[in-house]
């Protein structure tokens, strides 16, 4: 059994992904980060029987923790990874946290006059800019971090780029999906230095999770 200093640190995001990833870890290794962390104010919990330490952090920060070596392994949405590319090893699509980054605009809105740059409200500044640039559309990107769906109705933007699971919030705010930008799911990411320092232990972890993902997929079919 590894000592405390030898535990592999896994950064798991708070919220929905914590619950979904916990089911995979429980299937793969018999440990649930959600159960270890719930009922406590601590943001870290050890599972020495599995050789792991789990830390619960904001979803948008997981990639930074792993890239800079504060955690060896993490779970990150593909939207985060493509918005700000990182030097990380991405060995596995976990098949959880499925959503879509979309372009949406008010239902029934008239097309903008030719040559007028659309005002695009979004938290995905890079994804949105690249998407419109690839279409040859000079868009004005307006950075927002919440309540993005109301931006068109308040006259702040002509369209939005946002992430959605069911589209219900979009419809409730009078928006319709115009385009899909990126299909998103959670990815397992690994620090590249850690991969060289602990190749066998990380290989076993990756393969255990790969088997759990395959089993979950087989059950869903």
Swiss-Prot record:
**Mind telling me what this protein is named?**
ATP phosphoribosyltransferase
Q: Gene name on record?
A: hisG
Q: What does this protein do?
A: Catalyzes the condensation of ATP and 5-phosphoribose 1-diphosphate to form N'-(5'-phosphoribosyl)-ATP (PR-ATP). Has a crucial role in the pathway because the rate of histidine biosynthesis seems to be controlled primarily by regulation of HisG enzymatic activity.
Q: Which UniProt keywords apply?
A: Amino-acid biosynthesis, ATP-binding, Cytoplasm, Glycosyltransferase, Histidine biosynthesis, Nucleotide-binding, Transferase
NCBIfam families assigned to the protein according to its UniProt record, in alphabetical order: hisG
Stored InterPro entries: ATP_PRibTrfase_cat (IPR013820), ATP_PRibTrfase_CS (IPR018198), ATP_PRibTrfase_HisG (IPR001348), ATP_PRibTrfase_HisG_short (IPR024893)
Recorded catalytic reaction(s): these are:
1-(5-phospho-beta-D-ribosyl)-ATP + diphosphate = 5-phospho-alpha-D-ribose 1-diphosphate + ATP
Main EC class of this protein? Answer: transferase
UniProt-listed GO biological process terms: L-histidine biosynthetic process
Query: Upper lineage ranks?
Result: Bacteria, Pseudomonadati, Myxococcota, Myxococcia, Myxococcales
**Can you cite an annotated GO cellular component?**
cytoplasm
- Compartments reported by the entry: Cytoplasm
Give the family per the record: Belongs to the ATP phosphoribosyltransferase family. Short subfamily.
Naturally occurring in which organism (per UniProt): Anaeromyxobacter sp. (strain K)
């Amino acid at each position: 059994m590894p000592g405390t200093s030898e535990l592999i640190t896994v950064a798991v995001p708070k919220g929905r992904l914590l619950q979904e990833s916990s089911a995979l870890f429980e299937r793969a290794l018999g440990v649930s980060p959600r159960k270890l962390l719930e009922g406590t104010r601590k943001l870290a919990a050890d599972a020495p029987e599995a050789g792991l330490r789990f830390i619960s952090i904001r979803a948008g920060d997981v990639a930074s923790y792993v890239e800079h070596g504060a955690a060896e392994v993490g779970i990150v949405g593909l939207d985060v990874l493509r918005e700000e590319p990182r030097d990380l090893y991405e060995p596995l699509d976990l098949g959880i946290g499925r959503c879509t980054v979309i372009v949406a605009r008010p239902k029934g809105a008239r097309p903008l006059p030719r040559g007028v740059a659309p005002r695009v409200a979004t938290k995905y500044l890079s994804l949105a800019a690249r998407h419109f640039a690839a279409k040859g559309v000079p868009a004005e990107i307006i950075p927002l971090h919440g309540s993005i769906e109301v931006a068109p109705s308040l006259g702040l933007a002509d369209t939005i780029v946002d992430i959605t699971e069911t589209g219900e919030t979009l419809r409730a705010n009078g928006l319709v999906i115009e385009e899909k930008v990126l299909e998103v799911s959670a990815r397992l990411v690994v620090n590249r230095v850690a991969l060289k320092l602990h190749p066998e232990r990380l290989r076993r972890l990756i393969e255990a999770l790969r088997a759990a993902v395959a089993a979950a997929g087989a059950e869903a079919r």
